[in-house]
Amino acid sequence: MRITYPSIDKLLDEVDSRYSLSVLAAKRAGELEAGKPGALDNYHNLKPVGQALEEIAAGKVTIDADPHGEADE
């Protein structure tokens, strides 16, 4: 399988590494499959992984640097 939309270059503009991209896409795809609402009005892809990648490319889904919400002192 080959990703054609969104392009890997566009995705890597939003996320700092391919590893981070794959983890973020997998987690978001899991949320979409579990029934969480999509962040976009229209999708080009029918499958949750493709939809997650579209959301990442659009800047709607990002990595939370501090998932526990603790401020650095």
UniProtKB/Swiss-Prot annotation:
GO terms for molecular function: DNA binding; DNA-directed RNA polymerase activity. It comes from the Bacteria. SMART domains: RNA_pol_Rpb6. Its EC number is 2.7.7.6. Signal peptide: none annotated. One of its GO terms (cellular component) is DNA-directed RNA polymerase complex. It catalyses: RNA(n) + a ribonucleoside 5'-triphosphate = RNA(n+1) + diphosphate. GO terms for biological process: DNA-templated transcription. Keywords: DNA-directed RNA polymerase, Nucleotidyltransferase, Transcription, Transferase. InterPro entries: DNA-dir_RNA_pol_omega, Pol_omega/Rpo6/RPB6, RPB6/omega-like_sf. The keyword Nucleotidyltransferase applies. Promotes RNA polymerase assembly. Latches the N- and C-terminal regions of the beta' subunit thereby facilitating its interaction with the beta and alpha subunits. The RNAP catalytic core consists of 2 alpha, 1 beta, 1 beta' and 1 omega subunit. When a sigma factor is associated with the core the holoenzyme is formed, which can initiate transcription. Belongs to the RNA polymerase subunit omega family. This is DNA-directed RNA polymerase subunit omega. It comes from Lactobacillus delbrueckii subsp. bulgaricus (strain ATCC 11842 / DSM 20081 / BCRC 10696 / JCM 1002 / NBRC 13953 / NCIMB 11778 / NCTC 12712 / WDCM 00102 / Lb 14). The lineage of its organism: Bacteria, Bacillati, Bacillota, Bacilli, Lactobacillales. The gene is rpoZ.
